[in-house]
């Protein structure tokens, strides 16, 4: 087959209630298993506004080095991946959740984003590269678990880092040494995405602390004015 002969492929999973037996068997060959449901983050430093809007930890490597320490990646409605490594399989992690992610097997009927009875919890992979070596031949599988990961909308939410990741992966698949991606100029305001904990802090600063500081400054000025008037 193509992969057995040293082929390269990219797979992006999506949530479905159908039994994808053949699809799962392909992933099994590369030590990859996929959770049945969708991941919710309970760590507010790893999601944006909605616990299904994941902002994973970016592992620094060849594919993420341009933005791993300076930008976020936006991965909404992702499934969880578990990737095994052995003598035949070499794994490069790219995107992972916090250790507090929760699998929601039936997201349409769930009652809470928090862990409930029967929910699987832990850290999950959202993106990885798996190299399989057999008979001195190495094949490569890139696997990602959010079908919205490489859309323009998701990439724009984080300043284009999703597109940077996609470009690096495609370069590897096509065996290009480098590629220049020039975004089309659009006269639209770029979205700024921050994790939920930072979003809450900024909100408290704007709604509570800033008015208090302004009120305090006003009182100080008034007291000084009254004191000066009575001199």
Language-model-derived ranges and their functions:
Residues 178-182, 214:
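Intrinsically disordered or highly flexible coil/loop and linker segments, enriched in small
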Residues 203-215:
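C-terminal substrate/ligand-recognition segments
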Residues 229-230:
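Conserved small/polar residues in nucleotide/adenosyl-binding loops
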Residues 212-224:
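Alpha-helical transmembrane segments
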Residues 8, 224-226:
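Basic side chains
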Residues 181-204:
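Short, aromatic-rich amphipathic segments at membrane interfaces
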Residues 1-178:
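Acidic, S/T/G-rich, low-cysteine, solvent-exposed domains in lumenal/extracellular/periplasmic regions
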